[in-house]
Regions:
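Conserved N-terminal subdomain of the carbohydrate kinase-like
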Residues: 2-109, 113-121, 269-278
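Charged C-terminal helix
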Residues: 239-285
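Conserved phosphate/ATP/ADP-binding segment of small-molecule kinases
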Residues: 121-205
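Short, small-residue alpha-helix embedded
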Residues: 150, 215-238, 242
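Generic secondary-structure signature for well-ordered alpha-helical cores
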Residues: 33, 67, 71-74, 98, ...
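Short pre-catalytic strand/loop immediately N-terminal to key active-site residues, enriched for Gly-Thr
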Residues: 15, 204-219
Length: 285
């Protein structure tokens, strides 16, 4: 029997709303990966579509958690960061990566801080610059075009050409140890795509496309990132993992699109079985 892969995901918990840890934990676990969590904050709901939500920042808890893990000899094969609660947490998270990641372990950074040309509530360019420092530790960095523009200090626009996407991915390679997965390529009609660039082989960059669903929904980035992380860790190549993650995200949107009352995420739970079938051969190796 092969040894179980162990991953730590660091991001917030929204008690209600399908995003962040409440997506990452079941999605990655379904790949047969043991998934530990480190909440950066606890919110009563996610921040989109709700008002008056409560937030408990957990920055002060991070050092004690890391110290306890050190005492217990707890290490991880991979670490995946998502929504980070405050700018003060970056140094603690970098320390956790440095001290709790096994040799040759992999780091996935989803710089979840912006979309549609705007920062999420509470974030600014200083936060983006700190996020760039965290991206430097990542073997895989997964920004959308808005996040990429903030990382690069470039103006954002709704549409980028294929050539502009490639140029931006090459510029982003300075922020990663290995791979850039740049999401949000819309130049192909009826398709939503991404570019996968290996900084060691930039001339072999790949574009991957899935059918486009014309619905904006909270949490789709988390479904994509979690699926990509899981598929990569069980052996899929980055382009294959990105294709699978994009397909699962599309299916989750399709499950949600006809329910106008479901405005707090996508029904990702309904696509987990089909994703498990897609990866069953890899899980049994």
């Amino acid at each position: 029997m092969s040894e179980t892969i162990k991953i730590l995901t660091i991001q917030d918990i929204s008690c209600y709303g399908q995003c962040s840890i409440t997506v990452a934990l079941p999605m990655i676990s379904a790949f047969g990966i043991e998934t530990a969590v480190l909440p950066s904050a606890i919110l009563s709901t996610h921040t989109s579509g709700f008002s008056g939500y409560t937030v408990r920042d957990l920055t002060e808890d991070l050092p004690a958690i890391r110290k306890h893990w050190e005492k217990e000899g707890i290490y991880f094969d991979a670490i995946y960061t998502g929504f980070i609660g405050s700018i003060e947490q970056f140094e603690y998270i970098k320390d956790i990566i440095d001290s709790r990641l096994k040799p040759n372990g992999k780091v996935f950074v989803d710089p979840a801080m912006a979309d549609n040309g705007e920062f999420y509530n509470g974030f600014d360019q200083d936060f983006a610059d700190k996020m760039g420092e965290l991206c430097n530790l990542g073997d895989y960095v997964l920004p959308n075009t808005t996040e990429a523009c903030y990382l690069l200090h470039k103006p954002w626009k709704e549409e980028f050409t294929k050539e502009e996407m490639l140029e931006m991915a090459n510029e982003l390679s300075a922020f990663t140890k290995k791979y850039v997965i740049l999401k949000g390529d819309t130049h192909k009609e009826g398709k939503l795509g991404m570019i996968i660039l290996d900084k060691d082989e930039p001339s072999n960059a790949e574009f991957v496309y899935n059918d486009r669903i014309n619905k904006m929904s909270h949490g789709t980035g988390d479904v994509f990132a979690s699926s990509f992380v899981g598929a990569t860790l069980v052996g899929k190549a980055p382009s294959s993992a990105a294709k699978l993650a994009g397909e699962l995200t599309k299916k989750a949107l399709e499950e949600t699109i006809d329910d106008p009352t479901h405005n707090y995420g996508v029904k990702f739970e309904r696509v987990i079985p089909s994703r498990s079938e897609d990866t069953s051969e890899l899980q049994s190796r």
